[in-house]
C-alpha cells in the first residue's frame, strides 16, 4: 500500500491554536505567523496548500530513508492492528540507526533482530518503502532548531531563504510537517530570490 498523511483529518494533539487539521494549521500559519518577502510568496504557497491532496509519503525505491515499520501479515490497512505500534521495537530500531545508520534496516535478519522476543516475527511484514525526499527535507527544522544546545528556544527558524522553486519543495514540506507535529509553521519569515 501507499502511505499518506491526511491533511484534512483532525490531528488530535491539543495544538489547535491555528486549526485542527494540517491544512487549517498551514493556511493560518501562512496568514498569521509568517512574513513573506516578496509578498507574492504568500499567495503562491497559500494556493498550493489550499488545493493540494493528501500527501503521499511513501516511495518504492531501492535507496532513501526507510519508513521503518511493520504491518501485520494478511491485515488490511483499515484494520486496527495493521500497523505494529510498539515502543520497545521502536527503541531497538532507533538504537540500531544511531550506531549503524539507516542501512541497519536493510541488513540480513533485520526483521528478527527488531521483533524477536517482543512479537512473533512471522506475524509481521517488514515495510521496505522509503519516505518521499521532501518529507525527509521538510524534517530539517526538527533537527537543526530543536533539541540542540545551540538551537532556538522555541525551535523556530527566523528565516527560510531559497529560490522560488522551494514554494513547492522545502517551504511546502517543512510547513506541512511542522503543522502536523508542532501545530504551526517552523519559520517566522520566508524570503525568495
Report each predicted region and the residues it spans.
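Structured secondary-structure scaffolds
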Residues: 1-193
Amino acid at each position: 500500500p501507499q502511505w499518506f498523511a491526511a491533511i484534512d483529518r483532525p490531528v488530535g494533539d491539543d495544538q489547535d491554536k491555528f486549526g485542527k487539521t494540517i491544512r487549517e494549521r498551514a493556511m493560518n500559519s501562512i496568514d498569521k505567523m509568517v512574513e513573506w518577502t516578496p509578498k507574492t510568496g504568500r499567495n503562491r504557497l497559500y494556493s498550493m496548500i489550499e488545493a493540494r491532496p493528501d500527501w503521499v509519503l511513501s516511495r518504492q525505491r531501492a535507496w532513501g530513508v526507510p519508513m521503518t515499520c511493520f504491518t501485520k501479515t494478511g491485515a488490511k490497512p483499515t484494520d486496527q492492528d495493521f500497523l505494529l505500534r510498539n515502543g520497545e521495537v521502536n527503541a531497538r530500531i532507533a538504537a540500531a540507526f544511531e550506531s549503524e545508520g539507516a542501512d541497519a534496516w536493510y541488513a540480513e535478519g533485520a526483521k528478527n533482530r527488531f521483533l524477536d522476543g517482543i512479537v512473533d516475527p512471522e506475524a509481521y511484514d517488514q515495510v521496505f518503502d522509503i519516505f518521499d525526499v521532501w518529507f525527509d527535507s521538510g524534517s530539517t527544522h526538527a533537527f537543526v532548531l530543536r533539541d540542540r544546545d545551540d538551537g532556538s528556544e522555541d525551535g523556530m527558524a527566523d528565516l527560510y531563504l531559497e529560490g522560488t522553486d522551494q514554494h513547492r519543495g522545502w517551504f511546502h514540506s517543512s510547513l506541512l510537517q511542522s503543522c502536523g507535529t508542532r501545530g504551526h509553521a517552523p519559520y517566522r519569515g520566508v524570503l525568495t530570490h
